[in-house]
């Protein structure tokens, strides 16, 4: 059994598809894959994922990096993930109708100074995506009206579509946002963040000198394809990470 770990949100967003496609792929020729025809998935934060890789509890993981990365672990970049600002149509009409589609903001860029009164959800403060957001907020000398903090970006989108609060969304969650919009008349609007050029990087994590099995190679290829799909999707919608979303 192939042991794969990632963070809770990423597990919910992409692991079901990866697990199903993986099992369909290796099931074509069972004898070549031995007992690694199925995946055992693990959820943990980045620090504990790194510990589990180092101790041999996981064959591989994908997440961000931390300063506590063990010396016997290697990493490879999979995805430069963008962070976006999300607000419902109802809340946009209430707080900033000038940002509605077709008006002056044709580039879909949100200046967070314009949204300081809007209630917002934030993720956990130790996450890299919140650190790069705070860098922008510090540069603007502005604080947000935070009404909810948790590590669940999919929950934040559900709160946003119910007009509880605006929120922030990583590129991996855009497909979930689009599914929400398909079922709701109160559409969620997505904006790039003015002054934010840093990305949230996702890495493949493995132990140094780890020997790949055939099944592991299949999963890594599928994971790389999925991350490439996410990168193309966010770039097609909002431009590449090399495009400047506007200075401060």
Sequence positions of predicted segments:
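Central regulatory/effector-binding core of bacterial HTH transcription factors
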Residues: 1-69, 150
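Acidic, Gly/Pro-rich loop/turn segments at junctions of secondary structure
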Residues: 45-114
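Hydrophobic hinge/microswitch elements
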Residues: 45-49, 57, 125-188
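Secondary-structure junction motif
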Residues: 95, 103-140, 171, 212-216, ...
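An extracytoplasmic/periplasmic, membrane-proximal ligand-sensing/linker region
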Residues: 233-248
